[in-house]
Amino acid sequence: MSRTETDSIGPIEVPEDAYWGAQTQRSLINFAIGDQRMPLAVLHALTLIKKAAARVNDRNGDLPADIARLIEQAADEVLDGQHDAQFPLVVWQTGSGTQSNMNVNEVIAGRANELAGQGRGGKSPVHPNDHVNRSQSSNDCFPTAMHIATAQAVKEQLLPAIAELSSGLAEQAARHMKLVKTGRTHMMDATPITFGQELSGFVAQLDYAEKAIRAALPAVYELAQGGTAVGTGLNAPKGFAEAIAAELAALSGLPFVTAPNKFAALAGHEPLAALSGALKTLAGTLMKIANDLRLLGSGPRAGLAEVRLPANEPGSSIMPGKVNPTQCEALSMLACQVMGNDVTIGFAASQGHLQLNVYKPVIIHNVLQSIRLLADGCSNFNEHCVAGMEPDAEKMAEHLERGLMLVTALNPHIGYDKSAHIAKKAYTEGLTLREAALALGYLTDEEFDAWVRPDKMLEAGSNG
């Protein structure tokens, strides 16, 4: 069953149970591309804008109070998730996001008209353009929704997940701060380090990435709303930009403000490009952590085997008993995806031709995907890998004892050249450092014991 809806192009049949109208239906027909739906976070952000605009327009006397109440009631239902199925449009549509903006306008109007007893859909008493979209344009609504959805995702999903992983690693670092092991540079044996020190480096890297993300947020809090079509504010009343930013801040609990220059806010997306760069930084940190832990966990008998990673599932369909570092692999894969997303975001953000960037949907699709992947990845990795990993102290001690770079402790006492001679002799002849040093006559047994002490090689000033 269907009903007839109309727009400036003419009549079109719309499913009878749909709240949307003609423009949404045309988009469904004309853009049957892929299956990547416009993120619900964007659609809910657009809905929040409609609610805020109705309040501001009501206060300004630009919207009848009864119409404003109907819009707000319908918007609240959308924000509650009651009508998520009414947003079927894909990312691959007009680059301004106009069709998704109209999808929201039509759904809110269609539900508001039903609440008013006029049946589902239609344009009376609530009109999708004249009332729901009053004082707005898709060109300022959509970039505003992009910023709202992004800020909410970062604050509600990503930052708590980073804190969770950082806390998990910090707990492991504190627990193993005195467990001495071989350090490695260039993938080769180096001077000693503790497992706790190694993990503390991960925590510091996460802290840096988190600070970069937080530093990008103030620009994301700046909203394009009020710029309307080209940034001039045509058809928006004086003071509307400031008023709706304040209303959105109150409704969301986030410190949104009006963008100081609406022309840049419509034509450029530097704030989201900058945030994406920070997300890429976090992805790089997670890649390093995942790679290091799977290297340390390699084995169990023919690898480093210094860390036992939790066994989440059987690892092979052909090799019985094999267990793989799957959490590390998943984390590193999503990091690759985020890095790829950043390339797309950076290119799309550069396409602000004249007064409007028309790559907005692909930008926000990738930004929100990156945030979601990073948030889920941090939480999942902490729960299923970091929390259950355990160091193999015996294996660490074995590698430390066999390591040749302990010879570095002799540099201040016998000099670099003699120390290098000891290391080379030990390596080529299969000797221990002690055996090589004594054979060369460079020091006594007692001096070796006094000077080569791994637990004293862990901080500045050691063996000076």
UniProtKB/Swiss-Prot annotation:
Keywords, in A-Z order: Cytoplasm, Lyase, Tricarboxylic acid cycle
Cysteine disulfide partners in this protein: none
Binding site for substrate: 96-98, 127-130, 137-139, 185, 317, 322-324
Reaction catalyzed: (S)-malate = fumarate + H2O
Subcellular location: Cytoplasm
Any single biological process term in GO: malate metabolic process
Pathway: Carbohydrate metabolism; tricarboxylic acid cycle; (S)-malate from fumarate: step 1/1
GO terms, molecular function: fumarate hydratase activity
Residues at the catalytic site: 186, 316
Entry's EC annotation: 4.2.1.2
CDD domains on file: Fumarase_classII (cd01362)
Signal peptide bounds: none
GO CC annotation terms, alphabetical: cytoplasm
Site description Important for catalytic activity, residues in chain: 329
Pfam family, one: Lyase_1
Ranges that cross the membrane: none
Remaining remarks: There are 2 substrate-binding sites: the catalytic A site, and the non-catalytic B site that may play a role in the transfer of substrate or product between the active site and the solvent. Alternatively, the B site may bind allosteric effectors.
Quaternary structure annotation from Swiss-Prot or TrEMBL: Homotetramer.
Protein's job: Involved in the TCA cycle. Catalyzes the stereospecific interconversion of fumarate to L-malate.
HAMAP family: FumaraseC (MF_00743)
Family: Belongs to the class-II fumarase/aspartase family. Fumarase subfamily.
Protein name: Fumarate hydratase class II
Organism field: Pseudomonas syringae pv. tomato (strain ATCC BAA-871 / DC3000)
